[in-house]
């Protein structure tokens, strides 16, 4: 039994299996998961677990070289600032929400949280540790 880090077996296995350039999506509770894309559903109730703590856990174990969110999230300055701070030195990129949903088709998995904030979704592209 693991005693630290990500304990969810499917999430831990996903991160361990990632290769350079692989896409993982951390999503709010409303993002549609494209057919054929695995969904690791962590949502329990409205807001539980929330987006940022799940993202923090993933970032503690995943090498990220690129991160993208929807332009529609920009008015939520609190989340944008939180994301920018947690992702440093990786720069946060923006695309429209429809394009973000299209990108999800290429994801290795969508991690569904209980987040209730509109557009609280992020595309994380795996980097390499060397």
From Swiss-Prot:
Protein residues bound to substrate: 28, 97, 119-121
Transmembrane helix keyword on record: no
Primary residence: cytoplasm
Gene3D superfamilies assigned to the protein according to its UniProt record, in alphabetical order: RbsD-like domain (3.40.1650.10)
Catalytic activity: beta-D-ribopyranose = beta-D-ribofuranose
Pathway the protein contributes to: Carbohydrate metabolism; D-ribose degradation; D-ribose 5-phosphate from beta-D-ribopyranose: step 1/2
Residues forming the catalytic site: 20
Chain's role: Catalyzes the interconversion of beta-pyran and beta-furan forms of D-ribose.
Assembly notes: Homodecamer.
Protein name from the UniProt record: D-ribose pyranase
Organism listed in the record: Heliobacterium modesticaldum (strain ATCC 51547 / Ice1)
């Amino acid at each position: 039994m693991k005693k630290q880090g990500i304990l969810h077996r499917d999430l831990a296995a996903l991160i361990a299996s990632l290769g350079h350039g692989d896409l993982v999506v951390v999503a709010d509770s409303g993002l549609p998961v494209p057919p054929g894309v695995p969904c690791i559903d962590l949502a329990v109730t409205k807001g539980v677990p929330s987006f940022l703590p799940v993202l923090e856990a993933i970032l503690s174990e995943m090498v990220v070289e690129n991160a993208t969110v929807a332009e529609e999230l920009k008015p939520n300055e609190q989340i944008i600032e939180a994301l920018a701070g947690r992702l440093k030195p990786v720069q946060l990129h923006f695309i429209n929400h429809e394009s973000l949903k299209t990108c999800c088709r290429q994801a290795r998995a969508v991690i569904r949280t209980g987040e209730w904030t509109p557009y609280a979704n992020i595309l994380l592209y795996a980097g390499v540790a060397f």
